[in-house]
Amino acid sequence: MLGAGTMGAQLAAHLVAQGIEVVLLDMAAPAGERSALARKGIDGLRKLKPSPLHLAEHASLIRPGTFEDDWGELKDADWILEAVVEDLEVKRQLWGRVAPAVSGSSVLTTNTSGLGIGAISSPLPADLQAVLDLLSDPPG
């Protein structure tokens, strides 16, 4: 999962409830623990009422990390779901970084409410394809 904000963290909670292993990546924190932003996203799940975590222990199944330190995790990922800020340039830059890091069999999806898949996926080479999804309110 790329992006540990509201959408990314809640989608991660939904996925682990389905038995899907999730690595939740976000930017490295400027000070302190580098994966603090991803951990903050996970911690925030416990505070929501109702919590999107089906079981409290599901939080421990989401592994926090950073784009900078844990990018290698993408190499073996079956599915890469991007849920970063709704900004075309941010998404394009991120997908440009994803392309050389993934296997050709990875499923790439972007979560967006109004940006076109063609514009977002333009940095991807022809042998990689991305899918647009709109999960506007992750189930709790």
What are these regions, as identified by a protein language model?
Residues 1-47, 101:
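NAD(P)+-binding Rossmann beta1-loop-alpha1 motif at the extreme N-terminus of oxidoreductases
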